[in-house]
Amino acid sequence: MLFDKVKAFVVEIDGARTGTEPVFHGGQAVAGRVLLELAGAARVGALRLRARGRARAHWTESRSAGSSTAYTQSYSERVEVVNHRATLLAPDSGDIATLPAGRHEFPFSFQLPISLVTSFEGKHGSVRYSIKATLHRPWVPARCARKVFTVIEPVDINTPALLEPQAGAREKVARSWYCTRGLVSLSAKIDRKGYTPGEVIPIFAEIDNGSTRAVQPRAALVQTQTFMARGARKQKRAVVASVDGEPVGPNRRALWPGRALRIPPVGPSILQCRVLSVDYSLKVFVDIPGSSKLLLELPLVIGTVPLHPLGSRSASVGSRASFLQDWGLCTMMDRPEAPPEYSEVVRESQLVCASPGPSSLLHDLGVTTEGPYFACLQEFRYCPPPLYSEEDPNPPSEAVRPRCMTC
């Protein structure tokens, strides 16, 4: 406006770096200030602040009501997870206060709820957090300033359920033009259910090809976004990482002694939201010429708190060693790497969409290719875990020492 005396009106949050969104988790205190700079004395009615966090899902579907009639069905659902209001400036007497020219600061602080939902952006839904300041003045439209912040809820993979090995087995009779070509079987296992971005998933698999044609084993990390509204569901799947094995010839058997699949910088699993969820799974499958693929799916949870360096990690390595012993692969086991911190993997420079994976792999898994492959989140500044060490300060006695921990 030509005679507007407001030179600057912004919301600042403590701890935020220039050009980045501040990051919090449930239970933390959010503090900052509203900055108001006036070119001259101005009359102000009130300055109000509102912090909001919303999870929403929305999509439309085309429906047919006959041969010549069509309509669009809309589905929407919204959940408010944060709603904080505060008045930062209210005149003591009367309805109007006069502020002199210059810079004015109005501090604020509030506590986030203990349990929140991780920030998320998807095609059919989102989880967003923001702080909005509104300046009310007489005879002038209200002026607003907004600041967005990110929430990442801790997902600790050091729980017994997420440290359990995941395994499965499937078999299929290969057929072509009503002719039986033999039995193809697949068994696979990973040493635990929970991982963090940047870690490598060692895939142990056995492919037994009893058919008369060569088959192609593959594995893929798949993200599934599920949106829920008015009793309906909408899903979006994307391949975020994949690895191919060597073809297995007719009547041959092949082993994967820990085929490595590295997890890219993806957002963590979202499991406790009423309107949307983000799940991950490892799909190990075999392409059989002339027949449908043989598919085995193992559930995964992508967390933010990495594996502890000693206790739970020893259990994970032990389960992996036990699996290798069962398959006679103990000599092939590599020394495990220390898991990276979440903030080392998911950084600002990686806030771009991943490049599309192989189109044939997407088609095989029934995954659509439109839209971003995954939503990366900004750097999450947890306190760093203890330094990683391969040596246990309290080693077990020789009588109970595992036979194959670091073969």
Curated annotation (Swiss-Prot):
Species assigned in the record: Mus musculus
Assembly and oligomerization: Interacts with WWP1 (via WW domains).
Family as reported in the entry's similarity comment: Belongs to the arrestin family.
Protein name, entry field: Arrestin domain-containing protein 2
Classification via InterPro entries: Arrestin-like_C, Arrestin-like_N, Arrestin_C-like, Arrestin_domain-protein, Ig_E-set
Gene that encodes the chain: Arrdc2
GO terms under cellular component: cytoplasmic vesicle; plasma membrane
